[in-house]
Amino acid sequence: MTEQRFNHKISRRTFLKVCAAAAAAGLTACGKTQAAAALPELTVGSDNYPPFVYLSNDSTPTGIDVDIATEAFARMGYAVRFEIIDWEQKTKLVESGAIDCIWSCFSMDGREQLYRWVGPYMVSRQVVAVNADSGIETLADLAGKTMMVQSTTKPEEIFLGGTDPRIPQFGELLSAEDRSVQYAMLNCGYVDAIAAHEAAILRYMQDCNANFRILEEPLLVTGIGVAFALNDTRGLDEKLTETFAAMRADGTMKQIVGKYLPDPEKYLEVDALEP
């Protein structure tokens, strides 16, 4: 099995700014208001990954994870800034303190001991997509085919690991640092299939009118979470866990997910995930 890496680095080291510093107002003795100090800011390391994190038409960062993070951290007394990072360097960045956490549809499966996790807060299916007219119907049909994935993702780990008996021998496995490359390669017929989070593929199909078909059998059904460094002792993970519980209870999670995905309840059924 051959792996080829396409070094299409995202040159746009765009810094996504969310939630400018907020000011609280308090009444003075004279009945006038007085602005309080700006909220402390947390930096979230992320990938450009619609519908979880992306730029809207007016260049405002938006998406499921942006909205959840903004609301959750505001309840905790923080502002938040999303920074697009080199995804392959995410662990080094969070451990060094360059970012406060990793938050971008980040699968927890197999990484449980690598970080301080908050979650899972959503369920995600890792799936394989092909062109609609492809003869590939099952995972077994991928034998001898050319597959493309984003580097350092769960699909790449699954395919390179060789431990899933459902996965046949590919003709070639390609990895790209920029996830958008795999969509273009499939659209043009340069690869036979791609693998990624189902919600991300569906969003691309909607936005770009792509005629893809998702195989019925998923590669993996997993929980996604927020990752803090193991050496982070500030207690942010514990406070965020409590805040998530409150947001689930008051319906905020469902409301946010429903803005971007149909049938939001199925994405929030984290209790049904296998331990």
Predicted ranges, named:
Residues T70, A79-D141, P218:
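Acidic, polar ligand-binding/catalytic clefts
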Residues A38-C105, D250:
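Extracytoplasmic small-molecule ligand-binding "clamshell" domains
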Residues Q89-K92, C105-L114, I158-G161, M185-V221:
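A ligand-binding cleft/hinge motif common to bilobed small-molecule-binding domains
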Residues L55, A69-Y78, P155-A176, M205-N209:
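Ligand-binding cleft/hinge of the Venus flytrap
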Residues D47, V123-V130, Q206-F244, D263-P275:
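Periplasmic-binding protein-like
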Residues V66-R75, I136, A140-T146, S151-K154, ...:
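Extended ligand-binding regions for polar small-molecule ligands
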Residues V66, F82-K92, L173-A184, C188, ...:
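Short helix-initiation/N-cap motifs at beta->coil->alpha
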Residues M1-I10, V18-T28:
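N-terminal secretory signal peptides
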